[in-house]
């Protein structure tokens, strides 16, 4: 289903954003 793909992409994007935020915090 299309909404499942959208949900998956949103989840991936959110995971990447969280990962980037954590990495930035660690690097500071």
Curated annotation (Swiss-Prot):
One of its GO terms (cellular component) is extracellular region. The keyword Secreted applies. Disulfide bonds: none annotated. This is Dermaseptin-2. Keywords: Amidation, Amphibian defense peptide, Antibiotic, Antimicrobial, Cytolysis, Hemolysis, Secreted. The primary structure of this peptide is identical to that of Insulin-releasing peptide from Phyllomedusa trinitatis (AC C0HLC4), and Dermaseptin-B4 from Phyllomedusa bicolor (AC P81486). It is found in: Secreted. Belongs to the frog skin active peptide (FSAP) family. Dermaseptin subfamily. Antimicrobial peptide with activity against the Gram-positive bacterium S.aureus, and the Gram-negative bacteria E.coli and P.aeruginosa. Probably acts by disturbing membrane functions with its amphipathic structure. Has an activity of stimulation of insulin release, which may protect the species from being eaten by predators by causing fatal hypoglycemia. Has hemolytic activity (60% hemolysis at 128 ug/ml). GO terms for biological process: defense response to bacterium; killing of cells of another organism. The modification Glutamine amide is found at residue 28. The keyword rRNA-binding does not apply. Pfam families: DD_K. Expressed by the skin glands. It comes from Phyllomedusa tarsius.
């Amino acid at each position: 289903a299309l909404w499942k793909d959208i949900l998956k992409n949103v989840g991936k994007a959110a995971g990447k954003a969280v990962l980037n935020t954590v990495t930035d915090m660690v690097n500071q």
